[in-house]
Amino acid sequence: MNKQSLFENIKRKKSFLCVGLDTDIKKIPDHLLDDSDPIFAFNKAIVDATADYCIAYKPNLAFYESMGVKGWIAFEKTVNYIKENYPDQFIIADAKRGDIGNTSAMYARTFFEELDIDSVTVAPYMGEDSVTPFLSYEGKWVILLALTSNKGSHDFQLTEDANGERLFEKVLKKSQEWANDEQMMYVVGATQGRAFEDIRKIVPNHFLLVPGIGAQGGSLEEVCKYGMNSTCGLIVNSSRGIIYVDKTENFAAAARAAAKEVQEQMAEQLKAIL
């Protein structure tokens, strides 16, 4: 999916919502535990309930890998179900990979050849040769970690050099030498607030994947005020605030209502550019 197609989906749905599929076997409704594949059963119900109101899904690999083979099978089934039934949805493998070149090449092969996923999150710490293997696939996206929403972002990402330049700013500037805004996005946490203004000075045209609204306390209005550009330029993720709002047999309907509420807020924000 290219950048224009992504924007067309945003305009059509009046939404830039990504639903995070951080599916924890300990948090899903009890009645699903009797299913032969409870993780997939949960994901399928969530996807069916929310697809009208979002433009992307983001399975977090840690939640699937923690369950071994069964978890990976559920992940693959989820990806295939979305592709077959909702082909306009942008799929993000939230894997945060990044290693020496030949290892990254294997990660890239997994997500882009075997699974044919649209994008994967990548950690930039090891530099260009750890990222470029992911960039060799036409039509696929790298979503590079830039400024995250966790407290630990202060340990490295927000540290300044002698000239006052912060590490995340170096990442943004240097990585633009590796790919353009048709193949690279950046992760920027919603809790970073005014930092979006500084980020847009460096990457005015790139899409930003923004986790951290909802349960993590980020402000959608603030993200849009400082981060939205003429093609929206935002994919805002909500996980717990949608998928875990209800643990009864009505969980899917509750998730749909939560997604609809976020979509309606996003539709208001999009009026500034549509």
Curated annotation (Swiss-Prot):
Q: In which pathway does it act?
A: Pyrimidine metabolism; UMP biosynthesis via de novo pathway; UMP from orotate: step 2/2
According to its UniProt record, which reaction does this protein catalyse? Answer: orotidine 5'-phosphate + H(+) = UMP + CO2
**Record-listed E.C. numbers:** 4.1.1.23
* Record keywords, A-Z: Decarboxylase, Lyase, Pyrimidine biosynthesis
Q: Where is the active site?
A: 96
Q: Where is the signal peptide?
A: none
SMART domains per the record? OMPdecase
* InterPro entries documented for this protein: Aldolase_TIM (IPR013785), OMPdecase_type-2 (IPR011995), OMPdeCOase_dom (IPR001754), RibuloseP-bd_barrel (IPR011060)
Q: What class of enzyme is it?
A: lyase
Q: Which Pfam families does this UniProt record tie to the protein? A: OMPdecase
Q: Name one GO biological process term.
A: 'de novo' pyrimidine nucleobase biosynthetic process
GO MF annotations, alphabetized: orotidine-5'-phosphate decarboxylase activity
The family annotation for this protein states:
Belongs to the OMP decarboxylase family. Type 2 subfamily.
**What is the name listed in the Swiss-Prot or TrEMBL entry for this protein?**
Orotidine 5'-phosphate decarboxylase
Q: Which organism is it from?
A: Bacteroides fragilis (strain YCH46)
Which gene carries the instructions for this protein? pyrF
